[in-house]
């Protein structure tokens, strides 16, 4: 029997402003967790990866796990290639972080105080019509689905 690769992904400390770790999540296989309290309104981590156009994203033959984030109207980031660890931040309909494109960089900011041990989440929902995916975030205000970039 082949041993399963149990190597847990890591956070790139150059991309994170706080002590974070990737670990098992109840929302998905992996999630990102705060190891210290994070105040409201603070930059938490930068989402890094390969820059792609919408056309390149649309034509990707998606593997099992996809780590595509929308930066702005033209550019997307593929976190599976050179990702900072932020690609393991899971979706919630009631997230504790939001993302902003600042000078061609995709940054995650805390929406409220995040406590040590808490899983970091963002809303994956894009403001365009895309494929709907079932959401299992467990938030009290869960919408049940979110729109996803790939078909």
Where on the chain are the PLM-derived regions?
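Catalytic cores of histone-lysine modification enzymes
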Residues: 2-99
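C-terminal SET catalytic tail plus cysteine-rich post-SET Zn-binding segment of SAM-dependent SET-domain
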Residues: 3-5, 93-151
């Amino acid at each position: 029997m082949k041993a399963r690769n149990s190597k847990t992904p890591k956070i790139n400390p150059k991309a994170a402003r706080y002590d974070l770790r990737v670990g098992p999540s109840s929302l998905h296989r992996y999630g990102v967790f705060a190891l210290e309290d994070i105040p409201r309104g603070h930059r938490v981590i930068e989402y890094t990866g390969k820059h792609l156009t919408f056309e390149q994203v649309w034509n990707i033959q998606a593997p099992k796990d996809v780590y595509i984030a929308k930066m702005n109207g033209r550019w997307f980031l593929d976190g599976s290639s050179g990702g900072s660890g932020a690609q393991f931040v899971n979706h919630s309909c009631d997230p504790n972080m939001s993302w902003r494109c600042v000078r061609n960089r995709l940054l995650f900011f805390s929406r409220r105080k995040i406590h040590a041990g808490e899983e970091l989440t963002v809303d994956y929902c894009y403001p365009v019509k895309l494929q709907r995916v079932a959401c299992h975030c467990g938030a009290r205000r869960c919408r049940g689905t979110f729109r996803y970039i790939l078909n």
